């Protein structure tokens, strides 16, 4: 292969550097959007879809959206590290002794069960709906409608929820309920924290306990 002449090499190098700079700038902006929206009951996935379109960047895609959420996961693990350590220790002790009276041990079971629905739903989407990324569900009209519906449900849960339950009363079925609500977040416009908070409030959880269960 003949080497490129200096006349051609310089413009190509400049274009590559410019493209890399643009990609990094886009990633930085979307990272800020993700960080600001992940911990509020609004869909970070929807904002990662809408903001680039408003700025004329196009859809970043499902893969980018999944990868950029790793920072939020690390932040959650760091913030709740003491809680998670207590849950792991209590669960290990309960498995060893066969007693599940410790609320932290029951919370460990609830967390494990709550992880299953979204994993199974994600696998099902991958296997049976290969065109999901380009489907109408990821369109702006669909995102707008879903966001309005979820906001209405969250407001309703505030009105009808008893807000009495605490984490000390957690049961395995609570984790499964939150997990099913979390699986809805695969639909753009459904906030993961919003859907899990809504389900917990409908189930009678106190606000702070509902938020803690949601993020754990």
Protein language model annotation of sequence segments:
Residues 1-216:
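Multi-pass membrane proteins that catalyze or facilitate reactions on polyprenyl-/lipid-phosphate substrates
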């Amino acid at each position: 292969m003949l080497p490129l002449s200096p006349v051609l090499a310089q413009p190509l190098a400049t274009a590559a550097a410019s493209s890399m700079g643009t990609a990094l700038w886009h990633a930085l902006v979307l990272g800020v959007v993700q960080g600001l929206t992940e911990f509020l009951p609004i869909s970070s996935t929807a904002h990662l879809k809408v903001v680039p379109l408003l700025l004329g960047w196009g859809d970043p895609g499902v893969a980018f959206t999944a990868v950029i959420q790793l920072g939020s996961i690390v932040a959650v693990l760091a913030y709740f590290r003491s809680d998670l350590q207590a849950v792991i220790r209590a669960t290990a002790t309960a498995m060893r002794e066969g007693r599940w009276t410790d609320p932290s041990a029951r919370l460990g079971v609830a967390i494990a069960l709550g992880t299953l629905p979204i994993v199974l739903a994600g696998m099902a989407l991958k296997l049976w709906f290969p065109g999901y990324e380009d489907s109408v569900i990821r369109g702006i009209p669909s995102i707008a409608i879903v966001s309005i519906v979820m906001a209405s449900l969250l407001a309703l849960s505030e009105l009808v929820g008893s807000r009495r339950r605490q984490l000390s009363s957690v049961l395995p079925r609570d984790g499964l309920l939150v997990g099913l609500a979390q699986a809805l977040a695969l639909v753009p416009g459904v906030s993961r924290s919003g859907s899990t908070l809504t389900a917990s409030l409908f189930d009678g959880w106190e606000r702070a306990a509902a938020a803690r269960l949601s993020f754990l």
